Design a protein with these regions (language model features):
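Metal-dependent phosphodiesterase/phospholipase catalytic core, i.e.
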Residues: 4, 22-176, 198, 218
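C-terminal active-site rim and adjoining tail of enzyme catalytic domains
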Residues: 176-258
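Catalytic domains of carbohydrate-active enzymes, especially glycoside hydrolases
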Residues: 1-12, 192-200
Length: 258
């Protein structure tokens, strides 16, 4: 397809191997159930991750990180989103409501959402003041080791929240970092600067033009999650976004090239 970047999500399984999957559970994407962290590699590899999408994909398995690297290393840039274990996450009723609104407005109805006007930023203090437990260094070193083995340290960057950014900065300071901390709390740019990030990954519907302008003024590359039509992607590029994540690459890329 020629995508300049691929975004993927990583979770460690019970054996400590790195599984590529969006969700912390296998329930939605396979014929199994349970948390990835509670399942062994062999248990996960026995699950069918393709049948629900199309009969043509029946029998496809959730890949290990190394299996993905064996296919794409040095062929494209990897945006490696290291997910935070659910047990470490802190939320509030207000944040749950914000997430529900995001889902209803922008996932269910695919609304093209321009940046919000200045003044709507509503930072939830409980999220900002929560204790941060650094991401497991042993697991993080496995990620770095895999990148080094496949000689693609120059073709990857790490995306995560405060726990991941803290560990990334300590363990592999030269590996570029992309900030997600505060992406639903209007504080993402400040945290990107706090953690010495090179990129920031905004969430549509929770971004203002002032946030984009501040990020660019500080030399940050601006990602945005997400846009699934050429019109929506173009609208975000026009206001200063550098890289748009999409679930629909081919039609979006074709539309933008016209």
């Amino acid at each position: 397809m020629g995508a300049p970047e691929i975004e993927l999500d990583l979770w460690p399984d019970k054996d400590g191997h790195l599984i590529v999957c969006h969700d912390p559970k296998v329930d939605r994407t396979t014929d199994g159930s349970g948390m990835i962290c509670d399942l062994t590699t062999s248990e996960i590899k026995a699950l069918d991750a393709g049948f629900w999408f199309s009969p043509a994909y029946q029998g496809i398995r959730l890949p290990l990180f190394e299996e993905v690297l064996s296919l794409v290393a040095r062929r494209t840039v990897l945006n490696i989103h290291i997910k935070t274990p659910v047990a470490q996450r802190v939320t509030t009723d207000k944040m749950k409501a914000r997430g529900k609104e995001l889902g209803e407005r922008h996932i269910s109805h695919a609304v093209i959402m321009p940046p919000l006007p200045v003044g709507v930023e509503d930072v939830i203090p409980e999220i900002e003041n929560r204790p941060i437990v650094p991401y497991d260094e042993t697991v993080f070193r496995r990620i770095v080791d895999a990148l080094q083995r496949f000689d693609c340290m120059d073709y990857a960057y790490i995306t995560g929240e405060a726990d991941v950014l803290t560990t990334a900065r300590a363990v592999a300071p030269d590996l570029p970092r992309c900030c997600l901390e505060g992406h639903m709390n209007f504080s993402i740019v400040e945290h990107a600067l706090e953690y010495g990030c090179q990129r920031v990954q905004f969430c549509k519907g929770l971004t203002t033009q002032a946030m984009i302008d501040k990020a660019r003024a500080n030399g940050l590359i601006c990602n945005l999650f997400w846009a699934d039509t050429p019109e929506e992607a173009r609208a975000y590029f026009d206001i200063g976004i550098d890289c748009v994540l999409t679930n629909n690459y081919q039609p979006v890329a074709a539309g933008l090239s016209r």
